[in-house]
Amino acid sequence: MSKLALDRKLAALEALRSSDDRAASRDQLRKALNDRNNYVVSRAAAIAADMRRDELLPDVLAAFDRFFVDPVKTDPQCLAKNALASALRDLGHRGAEAFSRGIVHVQLEPTWGGRADSAGTLRGICALALADCPLDPLEILTYLADGLADPDKLVRINSAIAISQLGRPEGVLLLRLKLLSGDGEPDVLGQCFTSLLGLAPTGGVSFVSRFLRSTDEEVRLEAASALAQCRDPRAVEALAEFWQEPLLSLDVRRAIVIGLGASPLPEAANFLLTCVSHEPPELAETAIASLATSRFQAESRPRLAAAVHARANAHLKSIFDQKFSPATPT
């Protein structure tokens, strides 16, 4: 297919978004889903999902199956399968067979000096989708346990998210083991901390707090950020104790302050007000900004104004006036 022909086909597909003729747009999307070009199919799948055309689910599923045949040739970079898997999930498909096929798919494609797997995104999409399928939860957790050890970072992150979404207590054990085993990517550990705290806040706070003592600065930062977003007041207590560490870096302290700004807990707002009163100006400034976007913005304003006034710091006064001006939405 020439570039001009491809561009025309893609433009025609995009035009379907504003079409008032549902029958005609359905037929054109169905035809595009059956196209040999994987990019055309990927766009058709995305448009079908965006338009909530769930009557096309059988066509999306058939296209998904088709691109597993000679996949390196028919679907380089998994463009079609990625979009089709996302469309299946977004359109409400809950059949586990498609997603269990996708979560184990590895597609090695030629690269400079060897071959590389292009199916990481697909496995990550299917990990999230499986959590919503009416499959035995232990079978789902088996897939997700493998996902936590996947070579692709996105798959590991999405597997941790899916474990939390599944909501099974057995998932706590997988997350604890993963955290104790470690991961070279701090983002993965951060998601595991967050998922664990969501599943088991009672025991999770004490477990995640252990990692505040890690010798790895990035691990400490991820653990602190996850605790700051936790809805258990004991997490704020753990962070307050951790805050007393004399060698705690400015980056970790700033991450705690920013994270607490998103907390729904009044204890978090009190902590931030204390920071404004007693911490160095750079941290006090961050605490003011965090309070300005928190759910406690309005009720904390009088105490915050008093704390800023007591500091007698022109820069902090300027930040407060900027963040808490009358035009600032509450």
Model-found features: residue ranges?
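Core helices of alpha-solenoid repeat scaffolds
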Residues: 22-26, 57, 96, 100, ...
